[in-house]
A protein has these predicted regions:
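Short, conserved catalytic/metal-binding motifs centered on acidic residues
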Residues: 1-5, 51-61, 96, 139-148, ...
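Active-site-proximal, Lys/Arg-enriched surface segment
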Residues: 2-89
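Short, basic/hydrophobic alpha-helical segments
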Residues: 34-44, 117-139
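Short acidic, glycine/serine/threonine-rich loops at helix termini
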Residues: 65-70, 97-103, 112-114, 150-156, ...
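Electropositive, glycine- and tryptophan-enriched low-complexity nucleic-acid-binding patches
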Residues: 75-132
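Acidic, His- and aromatic-enriched active-site or binding-groove loops in soluble protein domains
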Residues: 77-85, 158-173
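Short, surface-exposed basic-aromatic patches at helix termini and helix-loop junctions that form
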Residues: 133, 153-162
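An anionic, glycine-rich sequence signature occurring as long contiguous blocks
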Residues: 164-212
Length: 212
């Protein structure tokens, strides 16, 4: 009944930190059992630097149609929330497995390093194969340009994580990339080793100034 649900929520709200800790512990235990039962089909089966578990971080806008707690105007001129989510990538044959989500008001910044660090830590705590602070390259964190901050990348480096992070190009960077010699470019390949049509990669270490 509604009164029962209301009383339960009130009870849980009395000690939010303890309740969230218990819920996250239960979720991690359930995931460990599920991945163990999946055997070779588990996301962490045979995970190493060449075949890492990939965690995707991305924020999304959730609309609210009335005045709700933490609902605020968004950068897209909407009204609602801006949670930051973490999903384990199950590959082309599967879907994303949610492992962490940080609830945020609609006006939360897209590239807030502290939020990306918080969600990454919560996501790693949900993985059965991550113990200790230095996780290693068996886990790769993937984000769009919202994760392209020095503070967040320094955190990933300290934890020895692999990462693939987008970054917005400035006019100067675009010119420097355009001036690369043809032999600097090599074909890009997808996860199955198939060459991607029209896609090329180049090593930019020492080419771009990333100190800003």
């Amino acid at each position: 009944s509604d009164p029962t649900v209301s009383r339960l929520i009130a009870t849980l709200a009395a000690d939010v930190r303890a309740v969230l800790s218990a819920i996250n512990t239960a979720r991690a235990a359930a995931r460990q059992n599920a991945w163990r039962a999946a055997g070779a089909g588990a996301p962490d089966h045979g995970a190493d630097g060449a075949h890492p578990v990939i965690i995707d971080l991305d924020a999304t806008l959730v609309g609210a149609h009335s005045e709700k707690e933490q609902a605020t105007p968004t950068y897209k001129r909407g009204f609602g929330f801006h949670p930051l989510c973490a999903f384990v990538d199950h590959g082309a044959g599967g879907t994303g497995e949610p492992v962490a989500m940080l609830l945020r008001p609609g006006n939360a910044g897209a590239n807030t390093a502290a939020d990306h660090i918080t969600v990454t830590g919560q996501a790693l705590a949900q993985l059965p194969m991550t113990t200790g602070y230095r996780v290693g390259r068996k886990v790769l964190i993937r984000t769009d340009s919202a994760g392209g901050t020095h503070e967040f990348l320094d955190y990933l480096t300290r934890r020895h994580l692999g990462y693939s992070v987008g970054i917005g190009l400035t006019g100067t960077w675009a010119d420097q990339i355009s001036n690369l010699l043809p032999q600097a470019w090599t074909p890009a390949y997808d996860a199955d080793g198939v060459q991607r049509e029209g896609a090329w990669v180049a090593e930019l270490t020492g080419v771009l100034d990333l100190s800003g």
